[in-house]
Every structure is written in C-alpha cells, then in structure tokens.
Amino acid sequence: MIIEIVTILNFKNIEEGSLSFSPKINYLLGDNGMGKTNLLDALYYLAFTKNHTNLTDSQLINYNKDFAVLHAFYKDKDNIEEIYCGIKLKQRKIFKRNKKEYKKLSEHIGLIPTVMVSPNDTNMIQFGSNERRKFADMLISQYDKEYLRTLIYYNQALQQRNFLLRNALPSLSGEEFEIWEEQMGTTGEIIYQKRKNFTTDFLPLFKEYYYTISDKNETIDLEYVSHLDDHSLFELLYEKRERDKILGFTSTGIHKDDFNFLLNNFLIRKIGSQGQNKTYLIALKLAQFSFLVQKGLSIPILLLDDLFDKLDAKRVEKIIRLLAQKTFGQIFITDTNRKHLDNILTKMQHAYKLFYVSNGTIREIL
C-alpha cells in the first residue's frame, strides 16, 4: 500500500497543501514546530480515523477555521483507493471510501495498514497501562475485525455497568447488573484469549528486531498481565459489585489489563536509559510492521517521526541498514538534520523525494 497524492486543508498548522509522494522514501526536512509531524499525523488520521495523540477532532482544525479536509489517493497493486475525511466544528466527522460514506468508522480500520514511530510513544513506557493496551488493540484491530467488534461491544457494556454503578439506587436489582456483566464476561474472554495469542506470536519478531538494533547482552521480554489469568470475568464482576458501587466505576476487567515492558527482567521504565527506551519502542514498531505483513495485510506505510533522536551512531547505522531492505515499502522520515538525510540517501539507494517544511508550508526540493 502506498499513498500517491494527498490534499490537506486547515489541518493543524497546514492551511493548504497538495503533495505527491515517492513510492519509497519521503524525507521531511525542517526545524522543530514547523509542521513535519502534522503531516505525518494527517496520514495517520487517514488510516485510523483518529490522530496519533489524544487531541480531539476540534483541536485538529487550524486556528480561526471551522473545518478541515484530508483527501488522498492510495495504490495497492492495481487497485486505487480514494479516501476523504471532513471535520467540522460541532459536527460529526465524515469518512468516505471511493465517494461512499462509511456507516461505521470501524469499517475503515485495516484498509490502510500504517505504522508510526513518534516521540509520543515514550508514553507507552513512562505512563499508565492505557497506552500499552491501545498499542496492542490498534495492532490487532488492523488484521482482526472480530477483535475490533468485540472490543466495541465490551466497551459499550462497560459504559452501561458504570452508569448503573454511579446511579445505584436501593431498588436496583442484581439482574440489571447481570445483563451487562454477562456481556462483559463473554466479550472479555474473547479479547483476553486474542491478546494472549498475540503476545505469544508477536514476541519472537520483537526480540529479533531489538537484538538486530541493540546489544545482544541485553535481554528483553513482553508480558501480558490480566485479571482473567486466574478467574473468569463474570465471577470477578459479581464479587466486586458492591465495592464498585462505592467506587462508582468498574475496577476489574480487560480494560485494566497491562503489558509489562521488560529489560533485563526489570520494568524498562525503571532502569532503561533514553537510548534503550527509544530502541525498545522502535523494535516494537518494526515488529508491528512485520507482524501485519505476516497476517496477510498489504505492506504498511511507515511513518518515522524524529527517528534518530536519543540514539547513538551505532544504533542509527543499524536502523538505516534495516530500512534499506526491500522488506519495507513506502517510508516517511522527519528530521531537522541534513547530515542524517545525506547518510540515509547514500545507504538506501532507493527512489526518494525531499520536502522542506516551514510554518505549515510544504514544498518539494528538486
């Protein structure tokens, strides 16, 4: 899958732009804060119907404007896909595939396989379990439609149970809780098994990439931790119901699952250096790329934002060698350093386009 042309209107600081890309390497050069990341986020949004960070749709619209548009043409072998997205203040966003609007945005997930490496990924290591679950959920959802549907059903039941907990009247019967707890139990078990299987299948690829980039004297691991490891969710929800009424929310379930990121048998957030953290995250994302290909998806688009920051020259060199392999398809790389650009272009020897980004204006350098 490659993106051939994109038109952007009023998306973040990009007021207007129409760009055609190389099917291989697209290098975005410019100072920090000029709009390089915003272009990558636009491409990410077209793939996932949401931005890479936690901004609301209204925050994506350019200042003093009331709408934003993303319009792109993709090529997958001999097929052309036209994707349109319209965002308006205080209105529901519109996503269209080949001029036909989606009934559900979830139908779009997986059509444009995409992997993004971003400085914001450090949140997966440094902060709570939500970011780590989101990584796994977005990955699995790209190749497993049943997983995404089941996750939606689970979250709907979770919201209903939380509503009952916040408004628990003495007259409220246990049967009303059981309706939603049964749905959570059934869907939660499916999600648990799929996350467990994913972790087992994903780990070898992850280790392979990490040890290719880094020192083999380090050991890494990825552990899936769930309340369902020892109990059924339906039983847990029943046991915790009275306590949850006091708390006002559901304290147990697959929405509390976590993935332990381990380095030398310790949580990496406690012992990892900035370089080790960055290497860990890059290996995760490159493994995600290969995993999606293994699952039969088109070759993903790879978005690499500020890739070389906090990495020593040795690791940078190894990553460049990896990216130069024919395994990878279309790649977008942002950087402030022209030396990195020259180094990459010399070693990759692929077709490329170079763009200069300044104050939201993007122009190709011929």
Swiss-Prot record:
It holds the Pfam family SMC_N. InterPro entries: DNA-binding_RecF, DNA-binding_RecF_CS, P-loop_NTPase, RecF/RecN/SMC_N, RecF_2. ATP binds at residues 30-37. One of its GO terms (biological process) is DNA replication. Transmembrane segments: none annotated. It is found in: Cytoplasm. Keywords: ATP-binding, Cytoplasm, DNA damage, DNA repair, DNA replication, DNA-binding, Nucleotide-binding, SOS response. The keyword DNA repair applies. GO terms for cellular component: cytoplasm. Its main location: cytoplasm. GO terms for molecular function: ATP binding; single-stranded DNA binding. PROSITE patterns: RECF_2 (PS00618). It comes from the Bacteria. The RecF protein is involved in DNA metabolism; it is required for DNA replication and normal SOS inducibility. RecF binds preferentially to single-stranded, linear DNA. It also seems to bind ATP. Belongs to the RecF family. PANTHER family: DNA REPLICATION AND REPAIR PROTEIN RECF. This is DNA replication and repair protein RecF. The gene is recF.
